[in-house]
Amino acid sequence: MGKIENNERVILNVGGTRHETYRSTLKTLPGTRLALLASSEPQGDCLTAAGDKLQPLPPPLSPPPRPPPLSPVPSGCFEGGAGNCSSHGGNGSDHPGGGREFFFDRHPGVFAYVLNYYRTGKLHCPADVCGPLFEEELAFWGIDETDVEPCCWMTYRQHRDAEEALDIFETPDLIGGDPGDDEDLGGKRLGIEDAAGLGGPDGKSGRWRKLQPRMWALFEDPYSSRAARFIAFASLFFILVSITTFCLETHEAFNIVKNKTEPVINGTSAVLQYEIETDPALTYVEGVCVVWFTFEFLVRIVFSPNKLEFIKNLLNIIDFVAILPFYLEVGLSGLSSKAAKDVLGFLRVVRFVRILRIFKLTRHFVGLRVLGHTLRASTNEFLLLIIFLALGVLIFATMIYYAERVGAQPNDPSASEHTQFKNIPIGFWWAVVTMTTLGYGDMYPQTWSGMLVGALCALAGVLTIAMPVPVIVNNFGMYYSLAMAKQKLPRKRKKHIPPAPLASSPTFCKTELNMACNSTQSDTCLGKENRLLEHNRSVLSGDDSTGSEPPLSPPERLPIRRSSTRDKNRRGETCFLLTTGDYTCASDGGIRKGYEKSRSLNNIAGLAGNALRLSPVTSPYNSPCPLRRSRSPIPSIL
């Protein structure tokens, strides 16, 4: 019995942390990575994430020496960033306890929650782990994210809201240094495609591609350079001057009254006509501001990477509408016809659009952008507040109308002598003023019943307004903290990653460290493996690498394999599958209590030919070179 129990035990070494459990525990979630691992033989074949079948690894010709205790555990197969997995002991088990040990190069802290899900049937999200990391680990272990318990779902979803908010507050990713880095990154950030060779013999296209992102950042991004900051301060100065001029034009000290009476020939009487004209000094100041706004608008539209998006922008529309009336007014001021005067009167009314230039400050102040995004994100809360107020206004306006009529005098049936609430629509105004705690005092109840209704209306208004306000404040705090964090992020520089050598290259297996490349097991040399590993890591991390060597052909992209005649005798069992095929639940692997609502289990349990659909964290990765296969005495199971 002890031997059978030891054979049923499995030791999972995840990132150096060992976890011990039973195979039956791992089989409680069929179709997941650990369930398929527990159901298959250790000597079974391995399937990659793309479904390619790997040849199993034969044991070495001679027993290799064990690594020292402080040396890292040799890695297993490395497929597209899926993680490393190794099985200790070959056919047998070299663990003193008798159980088999498998190594996964994954996050050990998250795996504790994953293993607890196999044991209890409840998947909880750790509060001290970043959301994308936990999401990636769930995808690796083959667990559906919808299995997360409701108590942890908000914690799990927080990272997605944060990522969406961070995408809103864009900051420049360029720094000084290599000029090529700025040009390439600036072109990508502005949406300008990198089209080498478009520049003609005279190089006009090349100069335009260099000038366009710089000029656009100069007028659009005040944090890109010192010159951009100077432009931003100048724009801010003219905005404030224009708004100040607009306000001073309404003051009587800057208004000049002129007599426009025209004598009529053979007329018996004359009608005096007066017009109010603005002080010419304010007109000149406004003209200087309009010239600056016109210059800024033309430069931005010329160097805009996307003209259509520029025209559709609300702030740009406000700029155009605020600039156009000034030129029309100057052009029509010399005309004396009645139609021209009517148009001038209309243009003077339209000039109030200039006050909307204050919204241009959102380009320069993060706090204003945060406020705008907060109002946009709190639309549901504002709608809820309006509904609550509308219900309260309707209820209390009706109550105050009938409450005031209760105390009416017998000789005043309409109650118009002792109260101002003559009808319910008039009570709407009183209810709004009372619920918002303004209390103008123009309308107030005069009977004891009306006073009671007024007190209830004031209390209900305080509670109604106070309920959605904390949600709006929390949204503002979240957006503001994320905006500040986005601004303090270190600026990125484009890194140069050397290309991986081709198999046909004379330097394919050479290393500067003079490492030995003589392998009796048809292994690749360590120098080549290190170089390929660096290249694979750079590609997986999202860095771009350029090279003059042609891409690999499809056969060359296949992982490096070991050839052995023993492969024919291996059983065709899998270690990990992304498609279940004709997989069915094991006869002895019943569903435990607590797993009935598991979507990971319901997607495949008892079904044949259905696919295990996992939401990938990243897009499928096609390696431009053979992936790393290290020399290890431990046979790979993944």
Curated annotation (Swiss-Prot):
Residues 47-75, 538-572 are annotated as: Disordered. K(+) binds at residues 437-440. Its main location: membrane. Pfam families: BTB_2 (PF02214), Ion_trans (PF00520). It is found in: Cell membrane; Membrane; Perikaryon; Cell projection, Axon. The chain crosses the membrane at residues 230-248, 284-303, 315-337, 346-368, 382-401, 451-473. This is Voltage-gated potassium channel KCNC2. It comes from Rattus norvegicus (Rat).
